[in-house]
């Protein structure tokens, strides 16, 4: 998606500058930084939309487009998270899995709400009974939380046979734990991600991920 954004922006004569929202010890807010750099517009993707600095930027006079988040003052581009999750769960089911766990992103996010609702609706349609311990929360685009939740899932008395992650970065955190525990993918445990980023296709074995 970011590559597509860059290509289209360059066709229109714009340059793209990336700002890492995980950068600590910032001396300026995002809004101040954008004003200082004279940005003509901002696209916000994979950010913590509860961050006051992000909210300040969205409420400013600078044109802002949000990805997979709806804010009253911004143009929003959203993916079909409901259909995507349904397709992913049904594919996992078709591979023979009946014990499917889901590590979802932050509570309160519209993306999380859509995906979680679709997950529950789809497993109901398939006649599956998923225990509450199989559904857990971890931050988007972060490996530590997904690693912790993966370890807890695999240490359950009746662990899942497949774990869905909220994005490919989180999936890598889970994958690392699986390897550390001496398990093999997909022989001992299957995993699935969300995003279809290039990195997920560079790993071996190739990871199941939805675009």
Write out the residue ranges for each language-model feature.
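Active-site-adjacent beta->alpha loops and helix N-cap segments on the catalytic face
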Residues: 50-59
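Glycine-rich nucleotide phosphate-binding loop and flanking beta-alpha elements
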Residues: 49-51, 170-171
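Central regulatory/effector-binding core of bacterial HTH transcription factors
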Residues: 3-50
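Bacterial carbohydrate/catabolite-sensing allosteric modules
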Residues: 3-14, 41, 58-66, 70-211
């Amino acid at each position: 998606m970011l590559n597509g954004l860059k290509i289209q922006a360059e066709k229109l004569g714009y340059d793209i500058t990336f700002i890492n929202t995980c950068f600590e010890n910032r001396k300026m807010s995002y809004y101040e930084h954008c004003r200082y750099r004279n940005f003509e517009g901002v696209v916000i993707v994979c950010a913590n939309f509860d961050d006051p600095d992000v909210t300040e930027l969205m409420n400013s006079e600078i044109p802002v487009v949000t990805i997979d988040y709806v804010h009253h003052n911004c143009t929003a581009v959203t993916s079909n998270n409901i259909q995507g999750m349904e397709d992913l769960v049904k594919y996992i089911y078709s591979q023979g899995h009946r014990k499917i766990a889901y590590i979802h992103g932050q509570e309160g996010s519209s993306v999380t709400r859509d995906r979680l609702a679709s997950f529950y609706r789809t497993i109901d349609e398939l006649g599956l009974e998923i225990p509450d311990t199989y559904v857990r929360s971890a931050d988007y685009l972060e490996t530590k939380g997904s690693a912790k939740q993966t370890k807890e899932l695999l240490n359950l008395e009746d662990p899942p046979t497949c774990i869905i992650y909220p994005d490919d970065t989180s999936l890598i955190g889970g994958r690392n734990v699986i390897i550390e525990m001496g398990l093999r993918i997909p022989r001992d445990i299957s995993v699935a991600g969300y995003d279809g980023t290039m990195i997920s296709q560079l790993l071996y074995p190739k990871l199941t991920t939805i675009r």
